[in-house]
């Protein structure tokens, strides 16, 4: 209401201002409503255009977008039900994004920069073994699939801040296997466009945390350069606590490794970029794990190929200037380490329980110095065991010096091994083993010396159901054990000397080494009075006297 006390000119000006204000508000409101309505009409055209843009950048994958909405006033873009599928294995989709939002990062407008802020809510990544196999067989590396370009093509403004809220990642090895599950992933990264620290190698900061395999926790803090090509570079400090190792058993079985129980904790720093790879693990601790390597007749060829491949990989990565790997300390505590041979008749199992192992200074560069290993435990549950020595992991093949002591193992626990390789067993007795194994310049030397005491091979009560030939053989072996017994120590002692050249054009040094030591151990653990066993060539070494 215009006051009547004002002069006519003033009343006119006041009335005009009110009309202009009302007109401006009406027009502005109409524009807002029109823009709001138009934005909804644009949604139908926007969705297929964005979908086509993403697919033009992706290689080997394709995107399907359920809904897209652009608010024209604030330029906020909302995407719903974005699904990414692998062309080779489209089911299940490798990624689903229920909600994605792109908006202007208003804080940066103060500095005169127009950049975007992206948020993902409840994203889910599902990967199975078939998809991983297809990726390995592809000629295009995963990092060159066009992920960065596909994401940046969606929104006209460059992304400078990125956040993930409550993400979920699963890997399924095969039908029926429990998935590997990373849950409750939260990540925030800013300065992606290198605005504030353009001269810094890794200008972007990021933080992340997640639940690992339902019980473990992983936190990440570091810096990145998301503009590096062909893939982003990062340097990350990580802390992992209590990750259950049994979760990876379905995958580890493909390499003949069975894992039961156990928890892994570790901390360190990893730098990975197109120019350099640095892995610096300060500590890794495994508690209460049961690890069994199972040798199978049907996988024998694959096992040999795997050993050769691992050996070549080690040789390739050793002393590479752009690759630096170092593990300061690995501790395995209160665990069981086992070797199962299912290729023999009967099969047998060798194990050390109550294992405590410390491995220090493991690296891939010779100038880092030798690594040290110290292991204690109970061989076959009874033999007090200590293995200690030094080795160089950065050589062209195995290079180390190791001492082994196994005291007073119950010999009856080795009956499956004796039956498999000696075709006899024992009724009682104990075994002590001393060994020294050294490898340098592709030559192996040393000895394995077992000593047996209180051995009783034939027992009329326990062996009454055996055939007459087997009974006779065990009686002869038992008599031979008495003949070859050291009368001072009342022990049967034998020795297998190790010597040889690991260089072989048909097998790797690592494969040759493993085969020599395995054969020597089997030959040594069979009592020296079993003359059917042919020892390897004599070599050097100074074993303890029997």
Put a short name on every predicted segment.
Residues 2-25, 229-231, 271, 277, ...:
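Extended terminal
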Residues 120, 238-240, 284-286, 404-406, ...:
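Transmembrane beta-barrel strands of outer-membrane/channel proteins
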Residues 67-133, 147-172, 196-198, 203, ...:
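Flexible beta-edge/linker motif
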């Amino acid at each position: 209401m215009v006051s009547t006390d004002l002069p006519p000119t003033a009343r006119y000006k006041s009335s005009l201002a009110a009309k202009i204000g009302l007109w401006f508000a009406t027009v502005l409101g109409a524009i807002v409503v029109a823009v709001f309505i138009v934005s909804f009409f644009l949604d139908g055209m926007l969705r297929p255009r964005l979908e086509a843009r993403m697919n033009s950048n992706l290689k080997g994958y394709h995107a399907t977008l359920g809904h897209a909405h652009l608010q024209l006033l604030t330029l906020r873009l909302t995407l719903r039900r974005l699904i990414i599928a692998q062309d080779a294995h489209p089911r299940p989709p490798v990624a689903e994004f229920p909600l994605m939002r792109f908006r202007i990062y208003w804080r940066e407008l103060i500095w005169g920069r127009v950049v975007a802020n992206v948020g993902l809510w409840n994203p889910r990544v599902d990967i199975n073994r078939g998809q991983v196999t297809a990726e390995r067989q592809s000629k295009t590396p995963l990092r060159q699939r066009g992920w960065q370009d596909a994401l940046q093509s969606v929104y006209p403004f460059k992304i400078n801040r990125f956040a993930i809220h409550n993400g979920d990642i699963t890997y399924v090895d095969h039908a029926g296997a429990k998935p590997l599950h990373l849950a409750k992933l939260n990540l925030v990264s800013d300065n992606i466009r290198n605005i504030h620290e353009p001269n810094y190698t890794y200008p972007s900061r990021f933080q992340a945390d997640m639940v690992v395999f339902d019980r473990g926790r992983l936190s990440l803090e570091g810096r990145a350069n998301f503009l590096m090509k062909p893939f982003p570079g990062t340097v990350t400090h990580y802390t992992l606590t209590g990750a259950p190792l049994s979760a990876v058993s379905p995958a580890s079985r493909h390499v003949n490794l069975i894992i039961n129980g156990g928890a892994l904790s570790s901390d360190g720093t990893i730098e990975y970029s197109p120019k350099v790879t640095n892995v610096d693990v300060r500590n890794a601790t495994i508690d209460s794990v049961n690890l069994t390597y199972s040798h199978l007749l049907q996988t024998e060829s694959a096992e040999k190929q795997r050993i050769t491949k691992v050996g070549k990989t080690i040789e390739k990565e050793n002393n590479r200037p752009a690759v630096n790997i170092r593990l300061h300390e690995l501790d395995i505590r209160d665990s069981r380490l086992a070797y199962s041979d299912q290729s023999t008749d009967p099969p047998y199992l060798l194990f050390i329980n109550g294992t405590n192992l410390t491995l220090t200074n493991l690296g891939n560069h010779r100038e880092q110095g030798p690594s040290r290993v110290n292991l204690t435990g109970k061989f076959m549950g009874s033999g007090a065991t200590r293995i200690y020595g030094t080795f160089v992991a950065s050589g062209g093949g195995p290079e180390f010096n190791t001492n082994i002591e196994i005291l007073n193992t119950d010999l009856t626990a080795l009956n499956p091994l004796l039956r498999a390789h000696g075709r006899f067993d024992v009724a009682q007795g104990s075994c002590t083993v001393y060994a020294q194994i050294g490898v340098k310049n592709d030559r192996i030397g040393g000895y394995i010396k077992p000593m047996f005491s209180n051995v009783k091979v034939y027992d009329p009560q326990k062996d009454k159901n055996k055939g007459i030939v087997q009974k006779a053989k065990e009686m002869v072996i038992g008599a031979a054990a008495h003949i070859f017994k050291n009368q001072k120590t009342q022990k049967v002692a034998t020795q297998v000397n190790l010597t040889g050249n690991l260089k072989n054009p048909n097998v790797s040094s690592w494969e040759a080494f493993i085969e020599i030591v395995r054969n020597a151990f089997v030959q040594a653990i069979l009592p020296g009075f079993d003359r059917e066993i042919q020892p390897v060539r004599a070599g050097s070494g100074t074993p303890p006297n029997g």
